[in-house]
């Protein structure tokens, strides 16, 4: 077979794979987001789909949802309610149910991975506890979560649910501003942090690289690029282009208050941690060998 013919055949095969073995993408149900909730012992699953028949200035999404005894059953019933064949290749957001723990995250993550692998653009949130109507709220929830990702340069990929054997960390959606952060350890209750501690946790987990948060009891605002360096368990937090703004009349020591709050948050996040969320034990064992107990973590805040 000549080289041009081989290239043409490969192109045709790739096109068939992308469109679903000959079925045009425009004829399929394109899934953009999957939401899970848990109510009264049962699961609810909602698929947010691209509405390819919508007018350009109208609503661009449609939804289908179902309830089941398990998350897999609820998702399967929602899929069965659609007349067309589903396409998960453009799925870029999944919301885990509020109150989920590590085991739930593993189960739902595996279910999503089976549907959308390798899904490099798929991001994960934990849904808030509000009582949402899927038909009325799913599209706005999707847009809000994607906006939070852009504004805070935040991303938790699906693969990050599986990078550690004893825990994972996931940002949490909130309706006002910013985001929460969930530390989900194996065989332990979920832990949620908010505000500046949530953003510090996201930075330490490698899921964000900036701060944009109120602190000092809401009297000051910090906006900064952040980089983390680690030597053994000594963490350095490098703040670049840092802007500290007073939201009150008093001219306080804004830098001092920020450092104090970061130190307090770091101590709380690393005290009696049920999993190595910030990889400090991992780096210590790489330096000194497996099984060596790591010293207490320390934090230094550096303004650059």
Question: Where do the PLM segments sit?
Answer:
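Membrane-proximal alpha-helical signals and transmembrane carboxylates
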Residues: 2-9, 18-304
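Residue-level signal for mature regions of secreted extracellular proteins and peptides
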Residues: 14-15
